[in-house]
Each structure stands twice: as C-alpha cells, then as structure tokens.
UniProtKB/Swiss-Prot annotation:
Xref: PANTHER family: MITOCHONDRIAL DNA REPAIR PROTEIN RECA HOMOLOG-RELATED, RECA
Higher taxonomy: Bacteria, Pseudomonadati, Pseudomonadota, Alphaproteobacteria, Hyphomicrobiales
One term under GO cellular component: cytosol
Family matches, as Pfam families: RecA (PF00154), RecA_C (PF21096)
InterPro entries: AAA+_ATPase, DNA_recomb/repair_RecA, DNA_recomb/repair_RecA_CS, P-loop_NTPase, RecA-like_C, RecA-like_N, RecA_ATP-bd, RecA_C_sf
Molecular function per GO: ATP binding; ATP hydrolysis activity; ATP-dependent DNA damage sensor activity; damaged DNA binding; single-stranded DNA binding
PROSITE patterns the UniProt entry points to: RECA_1, RECA_2, RECA_3
Species in which this protein is naturally found: Rhizobium etli
Keywords: ATP-binding, Cytoplasm, DNA damage, DNA recombination, DNA repair, DNA-binding, Nucleotide-binding, SOS response
Domain of life where this protein originates: Bacteria
Assigned protein family: Belongs to the RecA family.
Cell compartments where the protein resides: Cytoplasm
Name of the protein in its database record: Protein RecA
Residue sites binding ATP per the record: G77, P78, E79, S80, S81, G82, K83, T84
C-alpha cells in the first residue's frame, strides 16, 4: 500500500500531464478543434482591438486607447447629457477605418441630420426601428452572429418594451418583465459578441429608487444583468454650458469610467460637446496639451515647439482647426504620453456615493 502511494507521488507530474493530454483530446473530439487551447499559443487573443470614442481624453482614461471590440459597453446618464452623441461619435470613428456599423433605434428618435454633422456616414449605417424589445434584441443577435458588424448601438435599454407590455392594457402591472428579457438576451449575446469581435453599446437611462436613505438613489433601467455583462460602464453628465457671449453653444461634459475590465477604473475626464459639432477635439488638444506640458502657455499665449497657436484658448482652437497636420502631431504626442496623463492629470473619481449601485467590478 505504501509502495503504491510512493510510486504515485514520484510519477505525479507524468500522470498529470498524461491525464491533461487525454482530457484535451477528449474535449477536442467532442466539441471540435480549438474549443480549448493554451492562452499564449494564440497571440491575437492578447491584443485588445479598440475604437476611439472621438474624445482623446476619454480614450486615455479608458487605458487601452478607446472602447474595446468584442465587448459589451454601457453608456448611461441623465437626459441630454450626451449619451447618443458619444455613441454616434464612436460609430463615426469606426466608419473612418472602414467598419460596418448598425444603430437599433428603440426610442425612434435618431436625428440623421445631427448624426451627419458628427461625421456618421448615413449611406453605410444600418438602422432598425423595432416595434418590441424582443424584436430589437433578436435583430441585435442576428447582426452580431453574422460577424460582419464592427459596432452596434442599442438606443436605449429603457425603450426595449416587452411584447406583453405593448399588447396589454395601459395600467397593467408586469413587474420584472424587462429585466428578465435583458437577462435572457445577454446570456445569449455575450458569447457571440466575443467570437464575432463586435462592440455592442447599450445606451441606458437613470431612474430614482424610492426610499433610499444612504448612498445614491439613482439606478439604471433593465435590471442588474447589464451591469455584470458590461466590460465598460460610462457615466456621462452635463456639468455646465459653453457660452459665446450670451449664447449657449455647447455643453461642458464629465464622463466617469465607473467599470473597466480592461484597465484601472474610476478615471474621470471633462470635455466640451459643441452643438452641431460633437466633442470639441481641438479644445481637448489645448487643455490636455497644457496639462501634459506638450503645449506651452505663457500668459494668454499658447505655443507648440516654439510655434505660436494663438492668444486665448478660442484662438488656439481655431488655429488648430485650420491646421489639421499640427493638430494631429499634438494628438500623437499626447497618445504617446497616455499613461503619464492618465496617472497624473485625469481625476480619479473613486467608487463614491455618486455611483450608487453602479461601481461594481
């Protein structure tokens, strides 16, 4: 008895390797080649493919240079905070690289004129305006499984009305119906999204929980499933107005990375969203450039590599808008120093009470 046990200990490594080989071959016979492999044997798995959000500061805050492909993203916030704008800017950036994009407009509120102003190629944008939540998610599932779509936006989770609710009476009480619909859909979608390398962005609204004494009373619609399945959750808020004399020409916006499976979360960034233009890219170049020491500020004058950009922020932005090559050069310099900028200059919001139940990892 003791000899057998000794022999097992001596041959333990050999037995384990043989047992592992037998298990791997059995799995491959049952489920096909490639159903299991060593992670390092496929270099493509390690690379994270991303698409820019249209905001340089947010790309840096995300830690990987943009939103990751093959993942579920949630963008939520109050009304008129810039949720759809951010999603459309991501579509525009993907289309610039030749990507195929789709927009599932459950709210039936997409403005094609505004989308074109943000740089979206309407001729090549797939759009669906479904009648029910089930139809919207079935269309999403079919497009994801095709493997041909790079970015798919669902606007919004709150508008994914279950068929039973539409067919029922106005005052009918149907608790948990939308949450169950989302939970089932995400269980089906998550594997297909990863295999097809499609980025699926769910836009969500916030609601108030009644009777909350401590912490934030805010919560997102559609139950808890999306919070768990999302790799990145962005909380977007309007914090002020951009004015030209007395006229309001844009919004000051703050985005907090509430959840991030790709890099450290809780980074916070602020930028301007201009009406009819989207994210002010030149404004970000000037602001981040000064913080990182790439753009020099002397009094009211801004300069880069001894070349004057202009007196005052607005003149510097106009100069960069008129000189796209120089703007691109500053952007590349900022992206090269992304790690330093993220650590030193992007505010770390931390999991505070403002996140409510949204700060989960």
């Amino acid at each position: 008895m003791s000899q057998n046990s000794l022999r097992l200990v001596e041959d333990k490594s050999v037995d384990k390797s043989k047992a592992l080989e037998a298990a791997l071959s059995q799995i491959e016979r049952s489920f096909g080649k490639g159903s299991i492999m060593k992670l390092g044997s496929n270099e493509n798995v390690i690379e994270i493919e991303t698409i820019s959000t249209g905001s340089l500061g947010l790309d840096i805050a995300l830690g990987v240079g943009g939103l990751p492909k093959g993942r579920i993203i949630e963008i939520y916030g109050p009304e008129s905070s810039g949720k759809t704008t951010l999603a459309l800017q991501t579509i525009a950036e993907s289309q610039k690289k030749g990507g195929i994009c789709a927009f599932v407009d459950a709210e039936h509120a997409l403005d094609p004129v505004y989308a074109r102003k943000l740089g979206v190629d309407l001729q090549n944008l797939l759009i669906s305006q479904p009648d029910t939540g089930e139809q919207a998610l079935e269309i999403t599932d079919t497009l994801v499984r095709s493997g041909a779509v790079d970015v798919l936006v669902v606007d919004s989770v709150a508008a994914l009305t279950p068929r039973a609710e539409i067919e029922g009476e106005m005052g009918d009480s149907l608790p948990g119906l939308q949450a169950r619909l989302m939970s089932q859909a995400l269980r089906k979608l998550t594997a297909s999204i990863s295999k097809s390398n499609t980025m699926v962005i769910f836009i969500n609204q916030i609601r108030m929980k009644i009777g909350v004494m401590f912490g934030s009373p805010e919560t997102t619609t559609g139950g808890n499933a999306l919070k768990f399945y999302a790799s990145v959750r962005l909380d977007i808020r309007r914090i002020g107005s951009v004015k030209e004399r007395e006229e309001v020409i844009g919004n000051q916006t703050r985005v907090k990375v509430v959840k991030n499976k790709m890099a450290p979360p809780f980074k916070q960034v602020e930028f301007d969203i201009m009406y009819g233009e989207g994210v002010s890219k030149t404004g970000e170049l000037v602001d981040l450039g000064v913080k990182a020491g790439i753009v020099e500020k002397s009094g009211a004058w801004f300069s880069y590599n001894s070349q004057r950009l202009g007196q005052g922020g607005e003149n510097a932005k106009t100069f960069l808008r008129d000189n796209p090559d120089l703007a691109r050069e500053i952007e590349l310099a900022l992206r090269e120093n992304a790690g330093l900028i993220a650590d030193r200059f992007l505010q770390n919001g931390g999991p505070d009470a403002d996140d409510g139940d949204g700060a989960d990892m």
